[in-house]
From Swiss-Prot:
Function as written in the Swiss-Prot or TrEMBL entry: Plays a major role in protein secretion by helping the post-translocational extracellular folding of several secreted proteins.
Family annotation (InterPro entries): Foldase_PrsA (IPR023059), PPIase_dom_sf (IPR046357), PPIase_PpiC (IPR000297), PrsA_foldase (IPR050245), Trigger_fact/SurA_dom_sf (IPR027304)
Residues linked to a lipid group, N-palmitoyl cysteine type: C21
GO molecular function, one term: peptidyl-prolyl cis-trans isomerase activity
Gene encoding the protein: prsA2
Species, as recorded: Listeria monocytogenes serovar 1/2a (strain ATCC BAA-679 / EGD-e)
A Gene Ontology BP annotation from the UniProt entry: protein folding
Protein name per its UniProtKB record: Foldase protein PrsA 2
Topological type in the membrane: Lipid-anchor
Family: Belongs to the PrsA family.
All residue ranges annotated as the PpiC domain in the record: 135-226
PROSITE patterns assigned: PPIC_PPIASE_2, PROKAR_LIPOPROTEIN
Lipid-acceptor residues (S-diacylglycerol cysteine): C21
Length: 293
């Protein structure tokens, strides 16, 4: 959850609240002068208005063409919750978000994702080319500890016959996975720390266990639970398509999709103060229009 995104969301919510209140009135009184609701609204509109109106507009445009269910949002929400483990509530609080406001942002992100996927070429020709270098997802468990000595201690216990799941519960500092034996969600290439990914994919058989692997998070011992199994294009096509679509969810492709959706929606900005809000999507600005007069 990047700070810039969170700050923008919080400011947009505040701007919406001010707009909903309407009317004048003071928000701050001093002997030197008062700060009115209108002054605060204008200041926030000037600083955050473009970002706010962009998201509201695209929510309307994309929501009319693509459907994101409550179940879709809840699934993504639970993924984040699992990723952050016991720290999730604290992260939301520190970010000035509630579960409701975070889910609102997730819904918008999923709308952009669905639109991008709908505008992506998934012909057999494209997918077969991608299949040449594609690797299936794998499922592994890991035990994460802070230092190498502790990792070697755990490694020795495994060699002595102790169960991986029991040691994960006892030693792992990954609170999101330790209680389920350290098992991670399935992942493919490019999804994990490079050193972790290399060590995981080097395990070829179920039950294989790695030596301690150092990453930015500490030291991992990895167990292969479900190795990669590549069969034929026809049998793997569904997984290949899902993987390819995910690989195409780049900032560049999403921006290209939003430009297309914006053009198709025949958008007209009526507020002169927000004329430049969509300049990145229509290639123009109010200053361009003024200079051409």
């Amino acid at each position: 959850m990047k700070k810039k995104l969170i700050l923008g969301l919080v400011m947009m919510m505040a701007l919406f609240s001010l707009a909903a209140c309407g009317g004048g009135g003071d928000v701050v009184k001093t002997d030197s002068g008062d700060v009115t609701k209108d002054e605060l609204y204008d200041a926030m509109k000037d600083k955050y208005g473009s970002e706010f109106v962009q998201q509201l507009t695209f929510e309307k445009i994309l929501g009319d063409k693509y459907k994101v269910s409550d179940e879709d949002v809840d699934k993504k929400f639970n993924e984040y919750k699992s990723q952050y483990g016991d720290q999730f509530s604290a992260v939301l609080t520190q970010s000035g978000l509630t579960e409701k406001s975070f889910k609102s942002q997730l819904k918008y992100n999923l709308l952009v994702q669905k639109a991008t996927e709908a505008n992506t070429d998934t012909s057999d020709k494209t997918l077969k080319k991608y299949y040449e270098t594609w690797q299936p997802d794998i499922t592994v468990s890991h035990i994460l500890v802070a230092d190498e000595n502790k990792a070697k201690e755990v490694e020795q216990k495994l060699k002595d016959g102790e169960k991986f799941a029991d040691l994960a519960k006892e030693y792992s500092t990954d609170t999101a996975t330790k209680d389920n034996g350290g098992q991670l969600a399935p992942f493919g290439p490019g999804k994990m720390d490079p050193a972790f990914e290399k060590a995981a994919y080097a395990l070829k058989n179920k039950g294989d266990i790695s030596a301690p692997v150092k990453t930015q998070y500490g030291y991992h011992i990895i167990q292969m639970d479900k190795p990669a199994t590549k069969t034929t294009f026809e049998k793997d096509k569904k997984a290949v398509k899902a993987s390819y679509l995910e690989s195409q969810l780049t900032t560049e492709n999403m921006q290209k999709t939003l430009k297309k959706e914006y053009k198709d929606a025949n958008v007209k900005v009526e507020d002169k103060d927000l004329k430049d809000a969509f300049k990145d999507f229509d290639g123009s600005s109010s200053s361009d229009s003024d200079s051409s007069k």
